[in-house]
């Protein structure tokens, strides 16, 4: 038996990963390839395609359910208000979860290598390999390393009789998981092109209809919908269906990829939009001004690491230390209204609210704790003093 006995391949059953199967044997010298498909909320049709293709290739095929782990990571992202250039990181967060699951199978099956079918232009190659290169297994990227083109893959599949009908997987490149659905490619790559309505599956065009829902949080984690406790996966799936019917969660952005490429991306993410908006509204109620300002910096750094797929980085641990310190007060409920394609917070309640109705009222003389309105006179005199002084100095100098 050779030193290169078995390799675990991230397997979708699509063109890229299908041609990788024989190439890993012919070009890299592996005796056996095993395919691993990780469930992070893809459509059932994708698993059927992977299973049928694996069977046609006589490929040992493993399916791993990682939806619970992925949902937990998504809720960590909610606590960090995680978003990258308007995108709630669905694909980015899924990749390290998928990579970890594949690595675990590879070790259990005695593999000496792990492989993926990502190209050398995208982000996924980096996210997968950031996890895998922390192991002692060989990391292989046939599409990137062999410089494969779409045309070559189609011709190669046809010559070898690989189970790819026409070598065409559809007009657009689509990635779906619990947290988001991305649509890219073809005419959508042109920034000036107006996408047709039929690119969307999770969301419908907004109408005049509205709906209000109540989202409950404990320690910053979403835990309930309209008073009913739900597990993370069920809560996300329910909100995707519910909010999607009101057109909530569409994003059309120019995204700066990790390798410096600027690309156009279209996303659908109803549940993510609702939960992120609700969480931010509750934080605004319970955190102090200074905490809110500093947490924006922490959230930004967490989002950058999340986009890079580096959710296990030491920096993320440190950032989450601060986040944990703030989230024990992010407990309460937020009422969200679906209206015109938006998920708008219209009410929020918490026992930790940093708010005093008496102090904020225009109908009371006292502010709070024995402080009266007239006590603000001294503060008002000093406020802006340095700026006034600076302007006088500047004006005097200009007159000379």
Swiss-Prot record:
Domain of life: Archaea
Compartment annotation: Cytoplasm
Pfam families: Arginosuc_syn_C, Arginosuc_synth
Reaction catalysed by this enzyme: L-citrulline + L-aspartate + ATP = 2-(N(omega)-L-arginino)succinate + AMP + diphosphate + H(+)
Main location: cytoplasm
Cellular component terms per the entry's GO annotation: cytoplasm
UniProt-listed Enzyme Commission number(s): 6.3.4.5
GO biological process: argininosuccinate metabolic process; L-arginine biosynthetic process; urea cycle
Gene3D superfamilies, A to Z: Argininosuccinate synthetase, chain A, domain 2, HUPs
Binding site for L-citrulline: 87, 123, 127, 173, 182, 255, 267
Binding-site list for ATP: 10-18, 117
Binding site for L-aspartate: 119, 123-124
HAMAP family found in the cross-reference section: Arg_succ_synth_type1
Protein name per the record: Argininosuccinate synthase
